[in-house]
Swiss-Prot record:
The active site is at residue 311. It comes from Photobacterium profundum (strain SS9). It catalyses: 5,6-dimethylbenzimidazole + nicotinate beta-D-ribonucleotide = alpha-ribazole 5'-phosphate + nicotinate + H(+). Its EC number is 2.4.2.21. Pathway: Nucleoside biosynthesis; alpha-ribazole biosynthesis; alpha-ribazole from 5,6-dimethylbenzimidazole: step 1/2. It holds the Pfam family DBI_PRT. This is Nicotinate-nucleotide--dimethylbenzimidazole phosphoribosyltransferase. Belongs to the CobT family. The gene is cobT.
Amino acid sequence: MFTITQPDTQPSDHIQHKIDNKTKPLGALGQLEAVALQLALIQQTEKIEIRHPHLLVFAGDHGIAQHSLSIAPSEVTAQMVANFLAGGAAINCFCRTNDMALKVIDAGIKVEPEDHPNLIKQRLGHGTEDFSQYAAMTDNTVLQALEYGANVVEVLNQQSCNLVGFGEMGIGNTSSAAAIMAALLNIPADECVGRGTGIDDQQLQRKVDLITQALDLHAEQLSDPLSILASVGGFEIAQIVGGMLKAAENKMTVLVDGFISTAAAMLAVSMHPEANHYFIYCHCSDESGHQRMLQHLNATPLLSLGLRLGEGTGAALALPLLRSACCFYNEMASFEDAGVTV
């Protein structure tokens, strides 16, 4: 479904030499230097740039949410989608201040929203099934979700966008992400489950128990990423996977947000390991398990701000760092240019 090749590493010595010969001590710009190197390898150009950056927020409801594993009911998903479209959410603020276009994708929320210029409807249903009792979705729905996510990114690629961030909204999706993590890493649910929106100890234990029950129920269907998505995934998570893989296929830079988006990235990398070369992990969230996910992906996040909101907020906040990496790479003088001797 996707043809992904890792960036040509032949220019890496030239790129690193260019970075090392800027007017600074070796490595003095820390992680920004690694970002510049990654962007230069992805783009394979003498100057690197960010063109028409977009943040895509995929929204979907989850059958597992009927067990009250969140402080918020499922109705909040649709309410927050309306808030995104009205421009009133945190992600709207961060996209506005960082000059990043925002699109909202209805992957399958309970209540279909009204049409809006910034809304893309790719509905797969009125929410997934309760994966503690049934498969979250069918195998065919997973394939449709991947295609839907890929289509959104392909449109952006045709519009000369070369960087896309992925966010999400869906009451219950931390449960889905934790189940995905447990299945991929083959570890117990209690090592993956966090408090999500801020649940108490009793709800936390209920969440662990339900996810453990689900993993036992679907044990024979958790052998590959697509089956994991069908068993315990979410409509929005599956579409994000498709979008990430299409972005990598198109050699676009991918900004990975928090716990849920990183679960999607884990699935994408499990399907196509080469995709990870195009992924920049924006932050380490406060959600339990996220740090372990990042370690599994051999990822060093750019930020650690204690975020646990989702929506793509960490991705939007990281964008200025990427712009700064481009600026120093393109414009900072070399020792020779500046007449500085060391």
